[in-house]
Amino acid sequence: MPEINTDHLDKQQVQLLAEMCILIDENDNKIGAETKKNCHLNENIEKGLLHRAFSVFLFNTENKLLLQQRSDAKITLPGCFTNTCCSHPLSNPGELEENDALGVRRAAQRRLKAELGIPLEEVPPEEINYLTRIHYKAQSDGIWGEHEIDYILLVRKNVTLNPDPNEIKSYCYVSKEELKELLKKAASGEIKITPWFKIIAETFLFKWWDNLNHLNQFVDHEKIYRI
């Protein structure tokens, strides 16, 4: 694996690069484990390295979507606006559990607490709804990138927020119209959004949003959307 100098990066974020992500093949079968650092190096991504991830979309009882702006300390895509929470299940027994995507949902609960300070008891795994999976690849810069099969998770609940400033620069709840305005700002270069959020917003998000009371029609645990 290539050696990358991380001396100039945020120390807390560098520590997280040692976490072990779940390596998978293109059909989401586990084939091993590798550090978060090696999973996100473009040099390895170009050789086909692929890992499991998730994206949470949390709506409050007013049907507004919780967005976050990634902190400037983040190694990949700093300062970008994105959906509620995006991260990775780790290669440990609790988060490797594949039955009903329980491991991924446990990981989402863990990261909602770590990033946004949402108490664990407010987002138990059984209240995190697994819709489908999306396979995508995108560069952050010349060194770092993303290559993931992303589990799409939806939550509908009012929650308590206490964000970690090392993870999150800002957050807001948005209506559909407010998100459309934000996407226009991103298209004009006024703000930055993450590539996976752009992809999901342009393809699936508004269909889900229009049908929050009828999400069963979008549940597909067999297909992996290649985007």
Curated annotation (Swiss-Prot):
Substrate binds at residues 36, 70, 74, 87. Keywords: Acetylation, Cholesterol biosynthesis, Cholesterol metabolism, Isomerase, Isoprene biosynthesis, Lipid biosynthesis, Lipid metabolism, Magnesium, Metal-binding, Peroxisome, Steroid biosynthesis, Steroid metabolism, Sterol biosynthesis, Sterol metabolism. Monomer. This is Isopentenyl-diphosphate Delta-isomerase 1. One of its GO terms (molecular function) is metal ion binding. GO terms for cellular component: peroxisome. Signal peptide: none annotated. Its EC number is 5.3.3.2. Belongs to the IPP isomerase type 1 family. InterPro entries: IsopentenylPP_isomerase_typ1 (IPR011876), NUDIX_hydrolase-like_dom_sf (IPR015797), NUDIX_hydrolase_dom (IPR000086). It catalyses: isopentenyl diphosphate = dimethylallyl diphosphate. PANTHER family: ISOPENTENYL-DIPHOSPHATE DELTA-ISOMERASE (PTHR10885), ISOPENTENYL-DIPHOSPHATE DELTA-ISOMERASE 1 (PTHR10885:SF5). Binds 1 Mg(2+) ion per subunit. Pathway: Isoprenoid biosynthesis; dimethylallyl diphosphate biosynthesis; dimethylallyl diphosphate from isopentenyl diphosphate: step 1/1. The active site is at 86, 148. Its cofactor is Mg(2+). It is found in: Peroxisome. The modification N6-acetyllysine is found at residue 176. A motif (Microbody targeting signal) lies at residues 225-227. Catalyzes the 1,3-allylic rearrangement of the homoallylic substrate isopentenyl (IPP) to its highly electrophilic allylic isomer, dimethylallyl diphosphate (DMAPP). It is an enzyme of class 5 (isomerase). Pfam families: NUDIX.
